[in-house]
């Protein structure tokens, strides 16, 4: 049984978010939650929220036992980028690219 949860358009860059996702892939959910709770990264808060949602989905929709769940898959895809302008000296302007991510967490009982 596999249950997934998604957070789309998360306001963090995929590169930074993948650093956190790689740490919890394949771990039991209790250990993964522990790692995410004490991680100092902003992306850890976002991934933890998605993992909590996936656990709740498994428990409510599938009747799964939380103690047996493992983080099956975690992947972070690139979302749309927002392009902004930053005024600079002498009438010039720089482009600022604000990246977004689509975070997907799949928990399974095997």
From Swiss-Prot:
Output a single Gene Ontology CC term carried by this record: cytosolic large ribosomal subunit
Which InterPro entries does the UniProt record give?
A: Ribosomal_uL22 (IPR001063), Ribosomal_uL22_bac/chlpt-type (IPR005727), Ribosomal_uL22_bac/org-type (IPR047867), Ribosomal_uL22_CS (IPR018260), Ribosomal_uL22_sf (IPR036394)
Single biological process term from Gene Ontology: translation
Which of UniProt's keywords are assigned here?
Answer: Ribonucleoprotein, Ribosomal protein, RNA-binding, rRNA-binding
* Top-level taxon in the UniProt lineage: Bacteria
Cystine pairs? none
Pfam families annotated for this entry?
A: Ribosomal_L22
Offer an example of a GO molecular function term for this protein: structural constituent of ribosome
Which function does this protein serve? This protein binds specifically to 23S rRNA; its binding is stimulated by other ribosomal proteins, e.g. L4, L17, and L20. It is important during the early stages of 50S assembly. It makes multiple contacts with different domains of the 23S rRNA in the assembled 50S subunit and ribosome. The globular domain of the protein is located near the polypeptide exit tunnel on the outside of the subunit, while an extended beta-hairpin is found that lines the wall of the exit tunnel in the center of the 70S ribosome.
Hey, which family's this protein in? Answer: Belongs to the universal ribosomal protein uL22 family.
On assembly, the entry states:
Part of the 50S ribosomal subunit.
* Name of protein: Large ribosomal subunit protein uL22
Query: Which organism does this sequence originate in?
Result: Shewanella loihica (strain ATCC BAA-1088 / PV-4)
The record lists the lineage as: Bacteria, Pseudomonadati, Pseudomonadota, Gammaproteobacteria, Alteromonadales
């Amino acid at each position: 049984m596999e249950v997934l949860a998604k957070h789309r358009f998360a306001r963090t860059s995929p590169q930074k978010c993948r650093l956190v996702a790689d740490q919890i892939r394949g771990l039991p959910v209790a250990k993964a939650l522990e790692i995410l709770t004490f991680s100092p990264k902003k992306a850890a808060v976002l991934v933890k929220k998605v993992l909590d949602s996936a656990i709740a989905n498994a428990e409510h929709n599938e009747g799964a036992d939380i103690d047996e769940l493992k983080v099956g898959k975690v992947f972070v895809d690139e979302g749309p980028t927002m392009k902004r302008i930053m005024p600079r000296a002498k009438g010039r302007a720089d482009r600022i690219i604000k990246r977004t991510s689509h975070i997907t967490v799949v928990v399974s009982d095997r």
